[in-house]
Curated annotation (Swiss-Prot):
One of its GO terms (molecular function) is ATP binding. This is Aspartyl/glutamyl-tRNA(Asn/Gln) amidotransferase subunit C. The keyword Protease does not apply. Its EC number is 6.3.5.-. Keywords: ATP-binding, Ligase, Nucleotide-binding, Protein biosynthesis. It comes from the Bacteria. The keyword Mitochondrion does not apply. Belongs to the GatC family. It catalyses: L-glutamyl-tRNA(Gln) + L-glutamine + ATP + H2O = L-glutaminyl-tRNA(Gln) + L-glutamate + ADP + phosphate + H(+); L-aspartyl-tRNA(Asn) + L-glutamine + ATP + H2O = L-asparaginyl-tRNA(Asn) + L-glutamate + ADP + phosphate + 2 H(+). Heterotrimer of A, B and C subunits. Gene3D superfamilies: Glu-tRNAGln amidotransferase C subunit, N-terminal domain. Allows the formation of correctly charged Asn-tRNA(Asn) or Gln-tRNA(Gln) through the transamidation of misacylated Asp-tRNA(Asn) or Glu-tRNA(Gln) in organisms which lack either or both of asparaginyl-tRNA or glutaminyl-tRNA synthetases. The reaction takes place in the presence of glutamine and ATP through an activated phospho-Asp-tRNA(Asn) or phospho-Glu-tRNA(Gln).
Length: 98
């Protein structure tokens, strides 16, 4: 037996402000019924003794320490630039004057 009827799909479509054809209503009813069947199968799985988790990985947001390191001077950074203006990289304009 279907878990969702064509009328229920039509109701959901109206709530969602979707204009569906009769063929689409039939198609979506079948697809949603298949989805709900799969969900029912998942819900039927015995999870007794299984610890709830939202992520199987225990190490989240592992980062290295932030350590100061030597970096280029302004002159060194601009030395290989095709063009520099007032100590900054000069690049072609990509946005309009607006």
């Amino acid at each position: 037996m279907s878990q969702i009827s064509r009328d229920e799909v039509a109701h959901l479509a109206r709530l969602s402000r979707l204009a569906l054809t009769d063929a689409e209503l039939d198609s979506f009813a079948g697809q949603l019924d298949a989805i709900l069947t799969h969900v029912s199968q998942v819900q039927a799985v015995d999870v007794t003794g299984v610890e709830p988790t939202d992520n199987p990985l225990k190490d989240l947001n592992v980062t290295r320490p932030d350590e100061p390191m030597p970096c280029l001077t302004q002159a060194e950074a601009l030395a290989e630039a095709p063009e520099a203006v007032d100590g900054r990289f000069a690049v072609p304009q990509i946005l309009g004057d607006e």
